[in-house]
């Protein structure tokens, strides 16, 4: 009886972890907002220069890292 209970509890925990991972796919870590910048004021995102901007690059020089560019908002 205890083995069935432990197995059931394990399945519930694994199911919860799986659902939590599926619920938060999120954006890649390199997409981030920089509060107070011109890029953030237009809802853009600062990304490393080697990453592709899905909607094109907004040519703003306000990303704090000198090696970052601003991606236009969706």
Swiss-Prot record:
Residues 1-21 form the signal peptide. Contains 4 disulfide bonds. It comes from Orbicella faveolata. Residues 22-31 form a propeptide. This is Small cysteine-rich protein 8. Its main location: secreted. Belongs to the Cnidaria small cysteine-rich protein (SCRiP) family. beta subfamily. GO terms for molecular function: toxin activity. It is found in: Secreted; Nematocyst. Keywords: Cleavage on pair of basic residues, Disulfide bond, Nematocyst, Neurotoxin, Secreted, Signal, Toxin. The keyword Signal applies. GO terms for cellular component: extracellular region; nematocyst. Induces neurotoxic symptoms on zebrafish. Has also been claimed to be implied in calcification, but tests on homolog proteins suggest that proteins of this family have a neurotoxic function and not a calcification function.
């Amino acid at each position: 009886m205890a083995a069935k209970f432990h197995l059931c509890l394990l399945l519930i925990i694994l199911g919860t972890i799986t659902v939590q991972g599926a619920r938060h796919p999120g954006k890649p870590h390199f997409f981030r907002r920089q509060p107070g910048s011109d890029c953030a004021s237009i809802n853009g995102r600062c990304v490393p220069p080697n990453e592709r901007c899905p909607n094109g690059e907004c040519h703003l020089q306000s990303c704090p890292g000198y090696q970052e560019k601003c991606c236009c908002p969706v």
